[in-house]
Amino acid sequence: MVGIFNIVIDEENFKVLDSSLHFEVEAGLMYPSVSVVSWMGLANVFEAGMNASILILPKDAFGNNISFSGKKMEFQEFSLSLISENGSFAGVLNSTHIRWIVSGYISIDFVLVTSGKFLLLVEKESQTLNGGPLPLEVNSGPLDVSNCVSIWKSELSTWQIFSKMEILLHQKDRFGNIVSGFYEFDADVVEVETGLSIPVADFQFEYVEPGIQLMSFTLSEPGNFLLTLSDMKHNKSISSMPYVYTVYIGYCDGSRSIVNGSGINASIAGESLGFSVYLKDAYGYPSPVQVDRLQVRIVLEIDSSIILPTIQPREALNGTGSSHQAATPLYEKHGGRASGNLVTQASIFDVTYTPKRTGIYRIFISSGNIVLNGGQPFIKEVYAGEVNVAACSVTQFNGKVPKEIKNEIVVLLLDGFYNPVPSQPSRLKFEITSANTSSFTTWEFVDNNDGTYTGSYLAMEVGTYRMCISFDNKHIQPCPFDVNVYSNGYFPRAYDDPVNVWEDESISFNPLENDYFAGDNASMLGFSQPGHGSLLRDGNLLRYTPMKNFSGNDSFLYTIADINGNLAAATVYIFVLTAPPQFVSFSGGLQATEDLISPRYGGFSGLEISYSDLLENISVMVQALSGSVILSPMLMQFRPPGSGKLSVSNGGEDRRVLILEGQVGVINPALQSIQYLGNENFAGVDSLRLSTKNKNGINHLDVPVFVEPVNDPPFINVPQYIMLESNGSESLIFHPERDKFNFSVGDPDLVNFPGGESHFLVTFSLEVTDGFLLTNLPSELINSTELKFKNLFQWQPIQTYAAISKHVNVKASGIRFRGTIRQCNDLMQQLLHRGGENGAVLTLKLSDMGNYGCFLDCTERISLPLHAEARVNLIRKRPLSSLGAHGTFMKYLVVVPFSFFSIKLFSLLMVLIG
């Protein structure tokens, strides 16, 4: 990574903290296979003759961008070449302009002149740039008539009368590219002797292939003619016009003519061969022609090389025999006759030739434009001759080999014309000329079917062995040659190395660590370039950095040499592990509302993962620490076929972990549908734990969830009635030992109140309809305490009081104060009631004073106060007589649920009965 970095020095014991040191890291040298090549403007379709431009983003071995601002750079080391669709080499491109542009790219301009679909290969230092090869399509330019080419089906300019002349007209632009489309051309035939234009009735132009027309017409008159194809409107003729041709009177029939002789059969290289040609008409009669109109072309299939034959016409004698012409004409290449005034006619020809190279030959024979053998060539094969030992050689052997290891020797057998000779393994033999032969084992030679033979041997003992290879007891050079056999420990052994590295990371390793070499001293001679990363060397240490976003397998070869110059090679197999999916987009915090599913519609936006392998199944686990995570119904989505299915489940001990499984293409939409519901009455900051997992590991991300509080009403837990002493004395109202009930007040917002319990204030009031309430209040509550007395309906603050041990005794029919929940509950635990012998009703009221939970800012989180109210029937027990106990008990059971008037009525009845 490049940039300016600070060094922070922190020492806790001596309280040292210094961050004043910094350093700068600059990009290294350009590494071709990491640098990125692309088309300028993303355009890759051009017309021939247009200027094309590519952009190169130079990077170092670690993927850092290189800036050449103010620095010199060698631009000429880039090579541009075209590869055709079938993978063959199509040519080298010459750059016309190379420059450095401000955006950080190198721009290379070049001109494209060859049409077709190609791959552009951009290389530097024999390394292909990343992103290449680039697809490229070049369309042909406009038609250039003067550059069009005509190709005759017959290579001779002589045509037999009544033949159909056929010419393939190739439409081309100015660069020689085929131009598609049907274009009109003008044809004109002129007789040479008269200079007059000859009318042709059946001129035909047929579009046979893209950019190729077939022009044809019938030759109905003998003589010498000129043919011109042109565009008369623009006064332009196609190239090589006019075409001079001769029409002669002849009746040769290619299918009835005969070719026979050993020269068209298989033969041995160097043999003189021959065959005879008998020209016949359609009725089988001899059809003589001028001898210069017979053409024989012998082509070697492998490289299209030509053999020049000798053609001799044979003269018929009174129909009973034949004799050869005295003069033997000379021929040009392709079997064409040299210029001369030969006018001899013949129908029988003898052809001789000598093939010296082995392979498949094609023999084309034609009389003028009439091709024999039905228009097809004769096929023959030439085999190698007898082995010429003087031309043979031992081409491969190793002068230093380990003992007890099978080693190989390669021998090349050639004939007298240096053709490889196959199928002769049994005639090859090993000959050991040294004295030590008892511990030496040989195997038969194996034919490699290309003239080479592989022989194997094994030496059990250390020493020098002198040997020869013989063919039919004749020694093949070099002979003898020495092979030195050493113990196995003499030679180095390189072992393959497996290396694991995370994608987008780098790893340094020494491939020689597990290799063996004598003397504990070896050096690395070199290494090949990996296909998907960079490789830097520091001594015997290599540092591999995969290309950005690449994961999978990579490899390279390396070669070592020991102190004796012995070599060994091995392969480093690199496994670039796909890192667990990373979150490329996530919110700094999610917003939610207490006790509500958030968001209300859809899910949280901004949660997205990236993963380099689009087809691998991965999983994402989502869990809230103080809540639950659910998946909202997702909208209908159209995904490409093969994108996989989404699996949704719950896991964990409490089944509160939402698990999404599938390919990254289906998980990302699901992440956009996640909803949150906090625990009951929870408000504050929660954490959403997102865990992404693949086959190589797991990655965690904690996203805060800010749960906005909602003001919950306070609550009062009291029973409907409480039984007190009947004599009207002081009685503890809420007695936990007497009444098994949780007497308490509270507020759900208190649990998550950030200011703590001491700052969560409420207003608590208690009023009794008869008698007095007595309690002992802490002195800090005096300022907020108000009292209500009998027959007074207003709350009054405490005017005078006497504090004992920071507490004040209070006696009134009503008490109201502002305090904490704990202080309210403490008051309830010590609240006394006096008087009211006939019972009373205690009313409890609790107000949260609008506390909204105060999250995050109490000044902005205040709402209208919420209240809780409860009434408790305080019943004074009276001793019952044995006579009225049963009835009294029943009345007691009936009146308990009623209100204050019911209690008064109950008391009156008790007095009357008593």
Swiss-Prot record:
GO cellular component annotations of the record: plasma membrane
The keyword Cell inner membrane appears for this protein:
no
Q: What subcellular compartments does it reside in? A: Cell membrane
Entry comment describing in which tissues the protein is expressed:
In tricellular pollen, expressed in mature sperm cells but not in the vegetative cell. In bicellular pollen, detected in the progenitor generative cell. Detected in the egg cell within the female gametophyte.
User: Which is a GO BP term held by this UniProt record?
Assistant: actin cytoskeleton organization
List the molecular function annotations (GO) for this entry.
actin filament binding
List where the protein spans the membrane: 893-913
Q: Which domain of life is it from?
A: Eukaryota
Keywords carried by this UniProt record: Cell membrane, Membrane, Repeat, Transmembrane, Transmembrane helix
Q: What is this protein called?
A: Protein GAMETE EXPRESSED 2
| Organism of this sequence | Arabidopsis thaliana
Gene giving rise to this polypeptide: GEX2
